[in-house]
Design a protein with these regions (language model features):
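Aromatic, loop-rich ligand-recognition surfaces of beta-strand-rich domains
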Residues: 1-117, 121-141
Length: 141
């Protein structure tokens, strides 16, 4: 969320490091509508992937990339997604929740909408990490 919603024609994303890998960049107004415009800046050649609504594509930003809305727009929210391997949780994807019971092993609790437990993405992604709960904290192996 953005506190200052003064209408501006141009917005610029400047990474704090060179070679920033970004998958998505979305600007929204106060009603949640996606604001679109023309890409500007030295990294514009690679920028189209930022707006393709695909979390698996990404671009490298070395200097900065900006957007020209054509007319001043009041931006209320900016959503960005770093490069990822799709092992996260995405709306519309199916997940399967597991728990471990000794000596049987891992048991499926069923396919369901994601919550905040270990979930296996059944649509994309193959990496998984096993953890144990020790002294009130998750220990990843």
């Amino acid at each position: 969320k953005i506190k200052n919603t003064m209408p501006e024609r141009y917005w610029r994303f400047v990474p704090s490091i060179r070679n920033c890998q970004l998958a998505e960049l979305v600007f929204r107004d106060a009603e949640g509508r996606v604001l679109t415009g023309r890409l500007i800046g030295p990294d514009v050649v690679r920028g189209e992937k930022l707006f393709d609504n695909d979390p698996l594509t990404y671009t490298y930003i070395d200097q900065w990339i900006g957007i020209d809305f054509g007319v001043p727009q009041a931006v209320s929210e900016i959503f960005y997604l770093p490069r990822n391997d799709a092992n996260g949780i995405f709306p519309g994807d199916r997940y399967e929740l597991f728990y471990y019971r000794f000596p049987e092993g891992w048991i499926s609790a069923g396919k369901q909408t994601a919550s905040d437990h270990w979930l296996r993405n059944k649509t994309t992604g193959i990496e998984e990490r096993i953890f144990t709960w020790e002294k009130g904290e998750a220990r990843f192996w």
